[in-house]
Amino acid sequence: MITLLLYLCVICNAIVLIRADSIADPWPEARHLLNTIAKSRDPMKEAAMEPNADEFVGFYVPMDYSPRNEEKNYQSIWQNEITDSQRHIYELLVQSSEQFNNSEATYTLSQIHLWSQYNFPHNMTLAHKYLEKFNDLTHFTNHSAIFDLAVMYATGGCASGNDQTVIPQDSAKALLYYQRAAQLGNLKAKQVLAYKYYSGFNVPRNFHKSLVLYRDIAEQLRKSYSRDEWDIVFPYWESYNVRISDFESGLLGKGLNSVPSSTVRKRTTRPDIGSPFIAQVNGVQMTLQIEPMGRFAFNGNDGNINGDEDDEDASERRIIRIYYAALNDYKGTYSQSRNCERAKNLLELTYKEFQPHVDNLDPLQVFYYVRCLQLLGHMYFTGEGSSKPNIHMAEEILTTSLEISRRAQGPIGRACIDLGLINQYITNNISQAISYYMKAMKTQANNGIVEFQLSKLATSFPEEKIGDPFNLMETAYLNGFIPAIYEFAVMIESGMNSKSSVENTAYLFKTFVDKNEAIMAPKLRTAFAALINDRSEVALWAYSQLAEQGYETAQVSAAYLMYQLPYEFEDPPRTTDQRKTLAISYYTRAFKQGNIDAGVVAGDIYFQMQNYSKAMALYQGAALKYSIQAIWNLGYMHEHGLGVNRDFHLAKRYYDQVSEHDHRFYLASKLSVLKLHLKSWLTWITREKVNYWKPSSPLNPNEDTQHSKTSWYKQLTKILQRMRHKEDSDKAAEDSHKHRTVVQNGANHRGDDQEEASEILGFQMEDLVTMGCILGIFLLSILMSTLAARRGWNVRFNGAQLNANGNRQQEQQQQQQAQGPPGWDFNVQIFAI
């Protein structure tokens, strides 16, 4: 009997194996179908190919987040937007992964859910599931997958979840995965570890380990460049190292930011011809309004440039618009990729059309024509826009531009730099190269490359007495030239400067690594494209990766996507506690890297959470770096006794510092000090029983629900919010502040929310009401004194007799006073409180 059962089992297993063999792995079919569709949409490249691309590209930054709503959106996309072919491909991938344990199909599924590839919806939970399975199948040998998994555990799947996170946040596990990925050669994982040791985040601070890791990455990056790229023409890449909050007046608002804007690649517009600079170039006074940049069409029959202007000033403005149109195509913008071929064609036609008539051009036209020639010569020299460089044409056009510049005092910087490189590396004329470099050293076109080349020449030809190579390289580094950062770091480490420290050397290598955006941070572009494509969760995932790598701009962008401060009378963002905590962490990390505004925002979030001790610590740190908003906030907290004992004298000192650091806030500062005097006087009169201005104070900072006393203006805010929600439907209320609009390359818009003057000046609602009352009293006093003087009343102003029309009028007023009824005597007193 037992033998019979064994035979039956063997037969059944054989049947199963035969059936399994008869069903082939569908991965080849799925891969073939995936190759027939686009992996992702590139809106920047699409804009570059359009003849009339829109220069105002907007995207939405969500304010609210709910895991339940995300799941609803995911299901809705699958039901309404996914096509039958997509469903078929997905089923093939799932079948290959589940039934055949195909590692390639499993990895493809993880990337589909992580990056919304092939137009599938984002799902962090499924991405985590397939990444875990892929690593199990490959025995943790794929460094890219291990790095993705490490970021998931470091961020808790970007802190998703409701009561419990979908992916647990485990810093220790993330650290182990980072170390494993780094051992397998993942440069990004090494960068994460180097940043952790440099900043002391989740690990003990160790500059020696940080230096070793950053130096190792820097050496590999240096080897990735060819000799021509490193020494002659360093590659130009489109940088997306930008904070998305800077498209919306920064983190704190217009006039309050301490950190310069990171948006350096917006569309260039021609300047106002009425500006002093243009008037000086042209030699006459002119007035002309800035107009949007137009496009130029190429006429293939006669090779002419067709503009879209036909007024009397078109000929003069035409060359200006041609230059800026070509410059935008050459450099690219955040919403439009580079189109060097179109820029080169436009400049070649400009050269063909204007060169025969260059003697008839006015100074303004000559100025911009020279810039066109220099850009065209530079493109011939680098080979951009064509298959290979044309050194002969580059030298000819650049020399022509210098000859025209000598006659019309035009710009010479770009031409001198390129001609210096040609003489140094092509014709080997060192003396002529040095001459060109010296002419270009003080020009705006010098980004540090001049000092970089002179430093190398000073080392190779000391007899030329160019200067100290170390000092020249340091100047090139300070100007931001990327190869100079590495060369200067090597000089420092070799002991050329005995005053340098390990921390300083690690910082230099860190700066070089972070600057190599094209290799170390290509996901910056992916994140920005995801925002334009309305995939904010994909953008958040990309920015979170880069934030872990130590990019300050990515830390701010990731935090901004997770939590934004609400406006006055606006509901706070509805999100999870995990996201809010992670946002604070990223803001704090950015603050430690020099972003003062991020520290203020982190303090504001703690302030809203009524954790006043942490808010005070962040404000104090930002105030030490001269943040106007942080100093103001410290005065406010001392005024109301939030996190510290109430101290009007110290609050006054902080308010005075605001006007000392920035005179634009003089009025706001003085009115706040006046309010302090009034409150101090009332407190003394009532023996500290006045609490009209006291904001809410928590009974227990750890409790979510608090029943503390709330100031009247906060109660009014809540009443207005309840009235709005009562009038709106549930859906309308949910969508009422679902998104905040950001417009790229144009004016800043926030939907229907307008930036109030009170926000710019830093006032609270209670401050405005109090100051209004005080101003009302003063205005009433002045009005009464004026009317009394005109009507002949007997008026004393602070004890002084008011006499506007001489002694005779005074005698008449005294007679009228003697005959008039009682009550016509006024004694106006203004007290200095």
Swiss-Prot record:
N-terminal signal peptide: 1-20
An example Gene Ontology biological process: detection of unfolded protein
Sel1-like-type repeats, residues: 103-139, 143-186, 187-222, 413-445, 552-595, 596-627, 628-663
Transmembrane segments: 768-788
InterPro entries registered for this protein in UniProt: Sel1-like (IPR006597), Sel1_AlgK (IPR050767), TPR-like_helical_dom_sf (IPR011990)
Main location per the UniProt record: endoplasmic reticulum
Keyword Membrane: yes
Compositionally biased intervals (Low complexity): 809-819
Keyword entries, A-Z: Endoplasmic reticulum, Glycoprotein, Membrane, Repeat, Signal, Transmembrane, Transmembrane helix
Cystine connections: none
GO CC, any one term: Hrd1p ubiquitin ligase complex
Start and end residues of each stretch annotated as Disordered: 805-824
Pfam family, one: Sel1
Domain of life, source organism: Eukaryota
Glycosylation sites: 101, 123, 142, 429, 611
SMART domains the record matches: SEL1
Subcellular location(s) per record: Endoplasmic reticulum membrane
The keyword Transmembrane helix appears for this protein: yes
Membrane topology: Single-pass membrane protein
Known function: Component of the endoplasmic reticulum quality control (ERQC) system involved in ubiquitin-dependent degradation of misfolded endoplasmic reticulum proteins. Component of the HRD1 ubiquitin ligase complex, which is part of the ERAD-L and ERAD-M pathways responsible for the rapid degradation of soluble lumenal and membrane proteins with misfolded lumenal domains (ERAD-L), or ER-membrane proteins with misfolded transmembrane domains (ERAD-M). ERAD-L substrates are ubiquitinated through HRD1 in conjunction with the E2 ubiquitin-conjugating enzymes UBC1 and UBC7-CUE1.
Family designation: Belongs to the sel-1 family.
Subunit description: Component of the HRD1 ubiquitin ligase complex which contains the E3 ligase HRD1, its cofactors HRD3, USA1 and DER1, substrate recruiting factor YOS9 and CDC48-binding protein UBX2. Within the complex, interacts directly with HRD1 and YOS9 (via N-terminus). In ERAD-L, HRD3 and YOS9 jointly bind misfolded glycoproteins in the endoplasmic reticulum (ER) lumen.
Protein name, per record: ERAD-associated E3 ubiquitin-protein ligase component HRD3
High-level lineage: Eukaryota, Fungi, Dikarya, Ascomycota, Saccharomycotina
Gene field: HRD3
